[in-house]
Amino acid sequence: MELLALRWVLLAGTLLSTSAASSALQEGDLGSITVIMDMAPNSFDDQYVGCAHVMWANLQKLKCTEFARNYAYAVGWRKAAAEWQKRWGYLAHPMQLRPEQAIALLAYSAASNLYQQFNAATRQGGCSHQYYVHFYHFKTLHFLLTQALFALRASQPRCYYVYRGVRGIRFMTQRGKSVRFGQFTSTSLRKDVAVNFGQDTFFVVKTCYGVPIKQFSFYPSEDEVLIPPFEVFEVTNFCTGNGRIQIYLRSKGKMSRHNCELLKPRGGQWGRGHQEVGLGLSPGLALPVLPCSNCSCWGSGHRAGDPIPAAV
């Protein structure tokens, strides 16, 4: 495949005007901002249906190109590759994931600014084909994380009840609304872990496309479950009280506006149109409702807005 030219450098701060800052806010930040949840229409949500083999064939060259243009990505990958070598480099038997997939998960979960840059870019990377081609410098990381989650889910397809805590951001929505995170979103199987990341907004989520990545995380004690950007959720409850928000989400299926986006210039045989998959409600038990202390539950909201930055 003839690789597309990557010609311009993404200007610092471009995404900040349209997306929320990371929930890992530093001490001393003043107050909380308000962000409205929606279907994240600008998200880059490719599932690479029918073209994964082509992406794999060109992965190394594209990855080197992105490393040259993205210092944080190159450094994060190098650190993750060293960790992979330490954990599994001398195993005689094959792993559940390819080395590149495992390294991608390690790089995402590391304590660095890579995941923040990646999530901010992913929330806006699908606003147009040209924007994706020229400004989205995480094409390989997105592909590898997507493939890793597919591979892990294939071995144990089930739903999980998870939690997500956010500090410094109050998310607004309404009961019955369909929403997406629009990025790879970290959650935890443990409520106490999620609480430590913040309670300005606290999510209780039933995910059927997110998968546990404990084995491939820099911080296995966090019991992380990683949710892909294309999973759709129904808001089953929205509570507010004592300056805090609680949002309950139930998996509704998955939806992508992009497919094989990188290959579109080669004749348009891939990635045409608006792809929707499995928008029926996922089977299983109803989402458990936890008590909201001194809060009211809303059934209405205001307007649509940005998806959620990584908190865990």
Curated annotation (Swiss-Prot):
Q: What class of enzyme is it?
A: transferase
Any GO BP: response to antibiotic
Q: What is its EC number?
A: 2.4.2.31
Report residues binding NAD(+). Answer: Y108, R164, Q183, S217
Disulfide cysteine pairs (residue numbers): C51-C260, C159-C208
Residues in the active site? R164, S186, E224
What GO molecular function terms would the record report?
A: NAD+ poly-ADP-ribosyltransferase activity; NAD+-protein-arginine ADP-ribosyltransferase activity; nucleotidyltransferase activity
Catalytic reactions of this protein: L-arginyl-[protein] + NAD(+) = N(omega)-(ADP-D-ribosyl)-L-arginyl-[protein] + nicotinamide + H(+)
What keywords would UniProt list here?
Disulfide bond, Glycosyltransferase, NAD, NADP, Nucleotidyltransferase, Secreted, Signal, Transferase, Zymogen
* Top-rank taxon: Eukaryota
| Segment forming the signal sequence | 1-20
Q: What does the UniProt entry say about where the protein is found?
A: Secreted, Extracellular space
A single GO CC term for this protein reads: cytolytic granule
Propeptide stretch(es), residue numbers = 21-31, 267-312
| Chain ranges passing through the membrane | none
TR mART core domain location is 71-256
This one is known as NAD(P)(+)--arginine ADP-ribosyltransferase 2
